[in-house]
Amino acid sequence: LMSITGVPDGEPGAGPVKVGVAVSDLITGLYASNAIMAALVEREQSGRGEYIDLALLDSQVAALANQALNFLFTGQSPQRRGTAHPNIVPYQAFPTQDSWLMLAVGNDRQFEAFCRAAGRGPLAEDPRFRSNADRVAHREALIPEIEKACRQKTTAAWIRLLAAAGVPCGPINNIAEVFEEPQVKHRKLRFDVAHAK
């Protein structure tokens, strides 16, 4: 995981970076809870118990998902790309006037909508960027254009504009900002409990 996490080689600050939380532990716990539920169903149906064998390594290798598949199909180890997705462009963080925006353009229709909303219509018509495969192949030409566009507005302005256009995006919040997010409050993801003392 660390080999594909961090700043790309050749850029300032390059090198592997630890993920900000104990992701292997969390994923293994989720896999374990699913395995336990499946074992309980089996016991209920057949009366037999199950032996669950799960290691952190198993979970981490499984969690490599598309990155592992990229390697298995091509034989080439994926490289670090910072916040960029290896197979979808543009799908990464961009600096705005005041902070950062995570842009998640998952298909050609969304790319066209982004270009129109950003006032960069010609990008959608450029043959280098017509399909996702084209955008992946010409990533180095496209990303600087999107960076220029994103720096023209605040993150909040982009979120309003792109939400109206149907383009997935969101702010990159620090932890304090996370707990102030309206949806986090609505979902009651923070709650206070009384301490014994």
Regions found by a protein language model. Name each.
Residues 1-105, 112:
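Active-site-adjacent "lid/gating" segments in soluble enzymes
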Residues 17, 84, 127-128, 159-163, ...:
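Short coil/turn segments at secondary-structure boundaries
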Residues 59, 109, 173-176:
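Alpha-helix/helix-capping structural signal
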Residues 60, 131, 178-179:
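Short secondary-structure capping/turn micro-motifs that flank functional sites
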Residues 89-165, 169, 182:
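Aromatic-enriched alpha-helical interface/lid elements that frame and gate functional surfaces
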Residues 164-197:
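A glycine-rich dinucleotide-binding beta-alpha-beta segment and adjacent secondary-structure elements
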